[in-house]
Amino acid sequence: KQQTSCKRESFNNIEVIAEYQEVSNSEIVKAAAELVDSGRAGTLSRMEEIIEFAQTMGYKKLGLAYCYGMEQYANAIETLLVVNGFDVSAVSCSVGGLKQSEVNDASCIHKVSCNPLGQADQLNNEEVDLTLVVGICLGHDILLNRSLKMDFTTLVVKDRKFNHAPL
């Protein structure tokens, strides 16, 4: 019996299945399945999954869009990716050194602004294959993701209250 998600489905199954058959989508589905098929689910960390997925997909150049407050972690991630054969472009949220007043005239903060649009432009210009998002603020992550022109995945979500582990 087919599940109906509480009978609230508003999409066409035939069209969705056809989308999965498109080469760019089917390659991702197959690479993702390799990470969990044959009893592998739960055996790899998220970082290990990303490395294996990127290798399977043939990605060579990875982007790292990170919060400057997580620079220590970003450096460790970059090192791990390089050791695993990837070229890495790491871009801090403070790229460009924009003043807060240039980005948000309603803010009372008088420091360098986060610049997710600049991060996206930098990574797009460097033509990375896959971007890992690390600790970008809510809202800024939306702007970043909306502007990236390549595949991307979130490695770390920012959650200041629960030490970046929101669940």
Task: List each language-model region with its residue ranges.
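Short, flexible loop segments at the rims of nucleotide/cofactor-binding pockets, characterized by
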Residues: G39-G42, S107-V112, L130-T131
